[in-house]
């Protein structure tokens, strides 16, 4: 009997929650972020960015010695 009452109370809490307060929105947003990160890793976007930064550092070092 306690389990049934607990189930009904929790069901009402979930149904009465505002859509903006939903935890599912955060989960879905996190999944999209993870998917984009994996996609960027596969395509090598971060690798190109790191390579560009390394070239800029080398250029700055050469300019400092000149």
UniProtKB/Swiss-Prot annotation:
<keyword id="KW-0027">Amidation</keyword>
<keyword id="KW-0929">Antimicrobial</keyword>
<dbReference type="GO" id="GO:0045087">
    <property type="term" value="P:innate immune response"/>
</dbReference>
<keyword id="KW-0295">Fungicide</keyword>
<keyword id="KW-0391">Immunity</keyword>
<keyword id="KW-0399">Innate immunity</keyword>
<keyword id="KW-0732">Signal</keyword>
<dbReference type="GO" id="GO:0050832">
    <property type="term" value="P:defense response to fungus"/>
</dbReference>
<feature type="propeptide">
    <location>
        <begin position="44"/>
        <end position="66"/>
    </location>
</feature>
<keyword id="KW-0964">Secreted</keyword>
<dbReference type="GO" id="GO:0031640">
    <property type="term" value="P:killing of cells of another organism"/>
</dbReference>
<feature type="modified residue" description="Arginine amide; partial">
    <location>
        <position position="43"/>
    </location>
</feature>
<dbReference type="Pfam" id="PF08107">
    <property type="entry name" value="Antimicrobial12"/>
</dbReference>
<feature type="signal peptide">
    <location>
        <begin position="1"/>
        <end position="22"/>
    </location>
</feature>
<dbReference type="GO" id="GO:0005576">
    <property type="term" value="C:extracellular region"/>
</dbReference>
<keyword id="KW-0044">Antibiotic</keyword>
<protein>
    <recommendedName>
        <fullName>Pteroicidin-alpha</fullName>
    </recommendedName>
</protein>
<comment type="function">
    <text>The non-amidated peptide only inhibits growth of human pathogens like S.aureus or E.coli, and the fish pathogen A.salmonicida. Induces hemolysis of erythrocytes from human and fishes (sea bass and lesser-spotted dogfish).</text>
</comment>
<comment type="similarity">
    <text>Belongs to the pleurocidin family.</text>
</comment>
<comment type="function">
    <text>The amidated peptide is bactericidal on human pathogens like S.aureus or E.coli, as well as on the fish pathogen A.salmonicida. May also be active against a variety of fungi. It can kill bacteria in less than 30 minutes (S.aureus) and 120 minutes (V.vulnificus). It induces hemolysis of erythrocytes from human and fishes (sea bass and lesser-spotted dogfish).</text>
</comment>
<dbReference type="GO" id="GO:0042742">
    <property type="term" value="P:defense response to bacterium"/>
</dbReference>
<dbReference type="InterPro" id="IPR012515">
    <property type="entry name" value="Antimicrobial12"/>
</dbReference>
